[in-house]
């Protein structure tokens, strides 16, 4: 027995030295496709001699195929092998795993003597080559698979015919196909995917492969699976999340970017939160070694680091700077330093910037509450300069974005105004409502063609009355009223009983009621032909008003007591003013309220003092926005002289300076000159 074992081991050593390892050890990727298993000469005492190569580390188990070595037990050779029906050849060992082999293709078969072992021809491969062609399917490339298949079900059909490792390729191919089809078709294809008989099999294969798959493939798979709409609480997604946690030490710079992208779209849960915590620790260690700017931005979007980004500003390309706005907005991180620097780069390279990028920048500025007049002006001037190359809907989209930022671009608005006057028929219902909203909100009035502009819009709206919704009609008429223009046909359509009833009972009723009250007020106070019309509406709730306390104290000192002004005055038509003062018509003398009541109406001027915020004006200008301009117009109709006090300016002044500031606002220049002479 000892001699036979010695001879056997000697033969193994001869095998190692007689041929190169590359000829003897054929490596294959692991195939999880439930292969056909064939047992030869099954015997419970059969077992393999593993780890026969002394050069292999004992902790690593490699995959070999078509190599088998039997062990002699009690004088007889016993074997047990497995044939794998599928497998494909690679140039390197992909994954460590133990694998049994088939005696049919072993180097030593039953009945072979120890002497014959030394004579075995290790270079004979013709039988192996024939079997290999039958056993190995063509390797699956997800890009090629996505090109060959037209639907998600086609990919699953391909998988069901010949499953191969790794399963991630099938999910990646399905996600590529899903991205290139329409939203409606994508929804239908996903339903077919979930009901496909091979889908569960693919999910099971993914879970089995998770621990041995390459880490970046695992992350790509998670991202594709989530994007395909697989429920986050499903066993497969949670298994992948848990496996990614366990293998997070394998995460390199590229994997950081993939993992951050996947986590951004996922809802919080125990495994997601744990993975984010682990990623945060990993980023703390590696963030200073990240070289790729896009990877840095993706990690910032998930984690929120901007210290590293500040050091890398000198390396930011134009593309990096444009993308940074979206990254900061996605993580709701308002880094003014980063935004300012990126704005400079965008301004310097504004020409040729695509529409989607410019809109994304403006929307990100809105989300971050970042106001950079130079950036907005640069974009507006670029669009105005290249006005003819833009579609009408693109220009309107720019103006809607500027309106949400409170920025009024006069040049661009005049360009569009002239276009509307020339071609009113090119406007759709949506275009008309949007244009009216922007111009009324920003209170933009053309010096020459304003009347023609409003008439063109009214004419275009009249032609669409048969297809416009009640809410859109209300929005359009509300905008016309703010601009002190009253088109007959749209108003007649709006005040019909059935339209009013629909507005009061459906949609955003609170907003509809408010706009209908504005319509009532404009019809009563402005010069219109509808003064006799009154739309019965529910009463609006009174809004709680808290007049500026500092301004109240300033008025008390300036007017020597509280008897000469009134606070929080409620007026008809749902208007209120912060303070009311009664003066003579020349605004040189202030009356107490008892004197004002006794004075003749011709000698008394009611003064409305309004403390207004910055939001009442367009960005960094003294140009009033639409609602405040309409309120002042209506207060003037009701007999008030309106004085606006900027609360942000008053807040910065000391009390003595504030009194002087308000005095100049209230009294006329004549009264101030008289006061200065007497002093």
Swiss-Prot record:
Coiled coil: none annotated. It is found in: Mitochondrion matrix; Mitochondrion matrix, Mitochondrion nucleoid. GO terms for cellular component: mitochondrial matrix; mitochondrial nucleoid; mitochondrion; ribonucleoprotein granule. The keyword Isomerase does not apply. InterPro entries: FAST_kinase (IPR050870), FAST_Leu-rich (IPR010622), RAP (IPR013584). Residues 607-664 form the RAP domain. Keywords: Mitochondrion, Mitochondrion nucleoid, Phosphoprotein, Ribosome biogenesis, RNA-binding, rRNA-binding, Transit peptide. The modification Phosphoserine is found at residues 113, 126. It holds the Pfam family FAST_1. GO terms for biological process: apoptotic process; mitochondrial large ribosomal subunit assembly; mitochondrial RNA processing; mitochondrial translation; positive regulation of mitochondrial translation; regulation of mitochondrial mRNA stability; RNA processing. It comes from the Eukaryota. GO terms for molecular function: RNA binding; rRNA binding. The keyword Iron-sulfur does not apply. Belongs to the FAST kinase family. Monomer. Found in a complex with GRSF1, DDX28, DHX30 and FASTKD5. Associates with the 16S mitochondrial rRNA (16S mt-rRNA). Forms a regulatory protein-RNA complex, consisting of RCC1L, NGRN, RPUSD3, RPUSD4, TRUB2, FASTKD2 and 16S mt-rRNA. This is FAST kinase domain-containing protein 2, mitochondrial.
